[in-house]
Structure formats: structure tokens, C-alpha cells
Amino acid sequence: MEQLGKKYEFTEETIEVSERTLHRIKAIRDFGYVKAGELGGFIEKEENLSHEGNCWVYNVAKVYGDAEVCGDAKVHGNAEISMRSDYIVFKNWWSSGRYFTWTRSNNMWKVGCFYGTGEELIQKAYKDSEISGREYERVVRYVESILADEKKRE
């Protein structure tokens, strides 16, 4: 895979959030739907937004602390992300290519217009197709294993 180097830089514009200084970002090359020169949202440090993939922080969205935006994730609007494990975004690689999200705070899944538990997601997916059911089940079980590992460490 070709390394394209940095994709954004900090501008002079800063804001203060939770006693942290966040910097407005600006794209320095084209990637995904972002064009060179486009202003983005605010991040505290480069570790908050990967230079790889098509991930981007838009508008007035804020990312800071231990949070990291990577892959093809997009943070929009007034979103404010400050912890690494607030939620996990996955991509449906087996059919539609759309993104879906698991949220830690309520242990719920959001896929298109579906919103529910992991078990409800698996049941719905198997009704759609054997492949979808199997793949969604795999992802749900992966998240469950992360949670089980965290409980062991407590």
C-alpha cells in the first residue's frame, strides 16, 4: 500500500474544551470526499485522527483525550468524542458496505434503521440471509469477547 504521508495540518484556530486546547484541522491533500484546503473540525493532538484511510473530523466536531478516529470513520456535526471506547464503528464488508455502530454506554447496536441488542441484531440478520446472520453474529461475539476480557482485568 502506498504511503501518502500526512493528510492534514493544524491551523492557527484553537478552542478550549474540558481544559484542553483543540486545534482546527485543514486537509493538505485530497482523500475520500475531502479536498485539499478543506477545513475540518477540532482535535487535540495528531493521535486523535489517523493520517491513513479516509477518516475525517468535520465542521465543529471535537475529538480529544484518548479518542482515536481511524479507518473510514467520519465524525460530524456537534459530536464530541473524548474516550477511546465510547463506541465502535464496523463496516458491513459482506453485502451493503454500510457502517454500523455498537455503543458501550447502553450496549446497543445501530444498523441503518435497526436499533437494538446484539441478539436482536443477529436474529434480524439471519432473517435477511444466512451470510448476514453469520457475519453480524461474528461481530457481536467479537464485542462480547472484548467486554469479557475487560471484566477479567478489573
Give the location of each predicted region.
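Glycine-rich hexapeptide-repeat left-handed beta-helix
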Residues: 71-145
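General "foldedness" signal
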Residues: 36-39, 56-57, 123-125, 135, ...
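Short, compact, well-ordered microdomains
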Residues: 55-64, 135-147
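Extended, small-residue-rich solenoid/repeat segments and analogous flexible loops
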Residues: 1-60, 64
